[in-house]
Structures are given as structure tokens and as C-alpha cells.
Amino acid sequence: MQPENVNANFVLADKIARVVYAETFAKSLRVVEALTSMIFNQSKQNVESIIDIISDYKQFESLCDNSARHNLLDVDSNNREFQMCFRVAMRMLHGNLPDMCNRATKFHRDEFLPKWATARGYVADIDGLLFYQ
């Protein structure tokens, strides 16, 4: 792998990990792997770049300035739970993360019910996140 690719993967993994951390609080490895898998599944299905997906404030509440989760995006990179998110993101970028969310491409927290979810059945419920195909 070229040095510039290593650096690009590091930067992208950091961005993915920050969003995953803010959305999951890194409650468990299972939920971190599931949300990271969902991001990858969405990139395969919609042919969107991962950076476009993790920049979508309509999908990730933490990206909204007025979200209570927004400040979690600034987590210290030495934080243990963030490091877990970072390692999972690197596994995904290197093709070493199996699908941990049953091919899901959407999610929401169990305290919300978006309109798009009312006509669908969820395929996984992991630590308060519901995943959909």
C-alpha cells in the first residue's frame, strides 16, 4: 500500500470512527461493528462514497449542530472507546469486517420512529439501534 493511501485510510477511519462513536457511545463492540457494517453496506448498495455517507446529517443526528451528540464528534483520539471504533473502521476499510447487521442499509435509535421505518420490519436490534434493509 502506498504511503498516501495509508494516510488517506487513517483520515477516513478517523472520520468514520467519530461518527460511529457519537451515534453509539461505543456501548459495545457489537453495535460498533453493526453500524460500521451498515455504512459499508450502504456504500455498496447506493454506490456512494463512504465520506458522503458519513457526512449525511439527515442520517446521522450527531452531525447536526444542535444535537446533544454533536460534541461527541470531538472525542479525544486517545479515548479507549473511540480507539475501538477506529480499529473497527480500519478493519472495514481493509475488507476485514464481516456484515454484522444482516445487510442493513438504514438505522435509527429505538426512541425515534422515522416515517421511512413504519412500513418496514427491522432486521437487527442491537443496543438500542434498529437496522433495516
Regions found by a protein language model. Name each.
Residues Q2-Q133:
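Bacterial extracytoplasmic/cell-wall-associated proteins, especially those involved in peptidoglycan
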